[in-house]
């Protein structure tokens, strides 16, 4: 069984762990850089990206994650953290050749749920203060999902990033299946 690490600084950790189990993988909560050893993939969950970034710096995660050679899935704030820039001064991993529009859909009260398509399958997506891709900086970045023309899912190399919370919807497991099939099992 594959082991999927879930960065345990902030976010819906239990919900991600449940989804990982549903795709027959073992979840491992990552709280220290040493916890990264032995995992087959990493999930960077949602939360508040500036806070997560600062904590990643404090705990020594930035360089360690940048040097991982495993698939990484970023959801919501995880997408922000993987990006090259947001127009705001904040710590980023800078591993994904996109810029991000933070909170592109508005504030917490503007959060919504909507059906989108990912990998040819419909997914009930939960958008909470969700980002969007602003600019694609490399031809290696592939769009994997859109919402009314706005880019909400991309992949590049062994990195996948989405602006919504798959862990919060029943059929969000489709996202984890897609990540497992197209990234983790191919690594």
Swiss-Prot record:
<feature type="active site" description="Nucleophile">
    <location>
        <position position="76"/>
    </location>
</feature>
<dbReference type="InterPro" id="IPR002161">
    <property type="entry name" value="PdxT/SNO"/>
</dbReference>
<feature type="active site" description="Charge relay system">
    <location>
        <position position="165"/>
    </location>
</feature>
<dbReference type="InterPro" id="IPR029062">
    <property type="entry name" value="Class_I_gatase-like"/>
</dbReference>
<dbReference type="Pfam" id="PF01174">
    <property type="entry name" value="SNO"/>
</dbReference>
<feature type="binding site">
    <location>
        <begin position="128"/>
        <end position="129"/>
    </location>
    <ligand>
        <name>L-glutamine</name>
    </ligand>
</feature>
<comment type="pathway">
    <text>Cofactor biosynthesis; pyridoxal 5'-phosphate biosynthesis.</text>
</comment>
<dbReference type="GO" id="GO:0042823">
    <property type="term" value="P:pyridoxal phosphate biosynthetic process"/>
</dbReference>
<dbReference type="GO" id="GO:0005829">
    <property type="term" value="C:cytosol"/>
</dbReference>
<dbReference type="InterPro" id="IPR021196">
    <property type="entry name" value="PdxT/SNO_CS"/>
</dbReference>
<feature type="binding site">
    <location>
        <position position="102"/>
    </location>
    <ligand>
        <name>L-glutamine</name>
    </ligand>
</feature>
<comment type="subunit">
    <text>In the presence of PdxS, forms a dodecamer of heterodimers. Only shows activity in the heterodimer.</text>
</comment>
<keyword id="KW-0315">Glutamine amidotransferase</keyword>
<keyword id="KW-0663">Pyridoxal phosphate</keyword>
<keyword id="KW-0456">Lyase</keyword>
<feature type="active site" description="Charge relay system">
    <location>
        <position position="167"/>
    </location>
</feature>
<dbReference type="GO" id="GO:0004359">
    <property type="term" value="F:glutaminase activity"/>
</dbReference>
<dbReference type="GO" id="GO:0036381">
    <property type="term" value="F:pyridoxal 5'-phosphate synthase (glutamine hydrolysing) activity"/>
</dbReference>
<feature type="binding site">
    <location>
        <begin position="47"/>
        <end position="49"/>
    </location>
    <ligand>
        <name>L-glutamine</name>
    </ligand>
</feature>
<dbReference type="GO" id="GO:1903600">
    <property type="term" value="C:glutaminase complex"/>
</dbReference>
<protein>
    <recommendedName>
        <fullName>Pyridoxal 5'-phosphate synthase subunit PdxT</fullName>
        <ecNumber>4.3.3.6</ecNumber>
        <ecNumber>3.5.1.2</ecNumber>
    </recommendedName>
</protein>
<dbReference type="GO" id="GO:0008614">
    <property type="term" value="P:pyridoxine metabolic process"/>
</dbReference>
<comment type="similarity">
    <text>Belongs to the glutaminase PdxT/SNO family.</text>
</comment>
<dbReference type="GO" id="GO:0006543">
    <property type="term" value="P:glutamine catabolic process"/>
</dbReference>
<comment type="function">
    <text>Catalyzes the hydrolysis of glutamine to glutamate and ammonia as part of the biosynthesis of pyridoxal 5'-phosphate. The resulting ammonia molecule is channeled to the active site of PdxS.</text>
</comment>
<keyword id="KW-0378">Hydrolase</keyword>
């Amino acid at each position: 069984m594959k082991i999927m690490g879930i960065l345990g600084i902030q976010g819906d950790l239990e919900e991600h762990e449940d989804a990982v189990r549903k795709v027959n993988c073992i979840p491992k909560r990552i709280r220290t850089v040493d916890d990264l050893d032995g995992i087959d993939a990493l999930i960077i969950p949602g939360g508040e990206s500036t806070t997560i970034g600062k904590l990643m710096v404090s705990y020594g995660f930035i360089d360690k994650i940048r040097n991982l050679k495993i698939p990484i899935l970023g959801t919501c704030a995880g997408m922000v953290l993987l990006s090259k820039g947001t127009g705001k001064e904040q710590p980023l991993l800078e591993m994904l050749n996109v810029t991000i529009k933070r909170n592109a859909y508005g504030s917490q009260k503007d959060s919504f749920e909507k059906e989108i398509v990912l990998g040819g399958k419909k997914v009930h997506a939960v958008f909470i203060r969700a980002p969007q891709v602003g600019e694609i900086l490399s031809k290696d970045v592939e769009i994997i999902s859109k919402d009314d023309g706005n880019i909400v899912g991309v992949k590049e190399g062994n990195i996948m990033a989405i602006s919504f919370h798959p862990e919060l919807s029943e059929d969000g497991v489709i996202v984890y299946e897609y990540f497992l099939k197209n990234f983790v099992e191919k690594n």
